[in-house]
């Protein structure tokens, strides 16, 4: 609410004239690396916009995503980027460009994220998700990594900077593979991204890299035939997702459940995650 008030001064008078009670629920596992906190922040922002009749031109969905990032970073102390704030709003599987957004400038002083939906090219993709059931504050990972990365950017070189550039390459190569329908190559880019994330975390002092449990689930998915698998979220817990070959979703899901059980991950959840074009939706109760 505070973040929205800073950008929508007309909201304060409307809130004084007409109160609101907010209740929330979610089926996103907490601290699982699946944008659970961002989803709730975005839902509340969208509800406030609708309830108080704020302009959906001035406070469009891009602006809501930007305000959500600032709410989490400035109000909640979560060191974070923009992907988790844009994807829930716009939905679909997408290619994102963060050009010009490195320094987290005030709203309006840097570009919005470029969000390119690609779902119409790949509705047949079959993703499987497995959570470790282990909670971790993403900021505890992102804060030292971001500080190190910014220091190397200022210096003009460094190992983390080199790894990040390679990670960017996996994104555009993965996009090309997806558009071509080359799922094997898409899977290779997912795997390569996982290797680079693991290396980045080790560079920043996380001796287990992406995390023992994450590695275990990634291996289980790959051994079951997944074309690619990687963590989602900050690592050291959270979740992984895997790209299953057409018709092989069930065997990958079964393998992930078996691996989680064998590892004693009693709070693990395993489920299919089909690509959907639907993003943020506001529904009014009668």
Regions found by a protein language model. Give the residues of each.
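Glycine-rich nucleotide-binding loop
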Residues: 19, 235-237
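C-terminal nucleotide
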Residues: 1-16, 53, 66-77, 87-231, ...
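Hydrophobic alpha-helical hairpins/lids featuring a short glycine-rich hinge
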Residues: 1-7, 21-30
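A short glycine/serine-rich beta->alpha loop
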Residues: 25-35, 72-78, 159
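Short aromatic/hydrophobic contact patches that present stacked aromatics
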Residues: 33, 239-241
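DPxDG-like acidic metal-binding loop motif
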Residues: 33-55
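Aromatic- and glycine-enriched pocket-lining scaffold segments that form the walls
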Residues: 47, 61-65, 79-83
């Amino acid at each position: 609410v505070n973040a929205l008030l800073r950008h929508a001064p007309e909201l304060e008078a409307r809130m004084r004239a007409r109160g609101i009670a907010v209740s929330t629920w979610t089926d996103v596992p907490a601290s699982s690396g699946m944008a659970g906190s961002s989803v709730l922040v975005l839902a509340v922002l969208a509800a406030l916009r609708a309830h108080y009749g704020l302009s959906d031109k001035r406070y469009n969905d891009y602006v809501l995503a930007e305000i959500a990032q600032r709410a989490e970073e400035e109000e909640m102390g979560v060191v974070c980027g923009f992907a988790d704030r844009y994807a829930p709003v716009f939905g679909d599987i997408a290619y994102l460009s963060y050009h010009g957004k490195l320094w987290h400038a005030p709203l309006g002083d840097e570009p919005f994220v470029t969000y390119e939906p690609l779902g119409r090219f790949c509705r047949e993709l079959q993703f499987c998700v497995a959570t470790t059931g282990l909670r971790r504050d993403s900021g505890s990972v992102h804060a030292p990594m971001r500080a190190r990365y910014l220091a190397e950017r200022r210096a003009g070189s460094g190992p983390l900077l080199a790894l990040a550039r390679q990670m960017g390459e996996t994104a555009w190569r993965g996009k090309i593979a997806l558009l071509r329908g080359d799922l094997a190559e898409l899977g290779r880019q997912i795997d390569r991204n996982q290797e680079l994330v693991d290396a980045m975390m080790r560079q920043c002092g996380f001796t287990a890299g992406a995390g023992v449990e994450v590695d275990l689930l990634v291996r289980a998915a790959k051994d079951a035939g997944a074309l690619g698998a990687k963590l989602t979220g900050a690592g050291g817990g959270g979740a992984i997702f895997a790209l299953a070959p057409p018709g092989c979703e069930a065997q990958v899901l079964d393998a992930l459940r078996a691996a989680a059980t064998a590892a004693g991950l009693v709070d693990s959840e395993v489920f299919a995650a089909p690509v959907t074009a639907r993003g943020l939706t506001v529904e009014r109760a009668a």
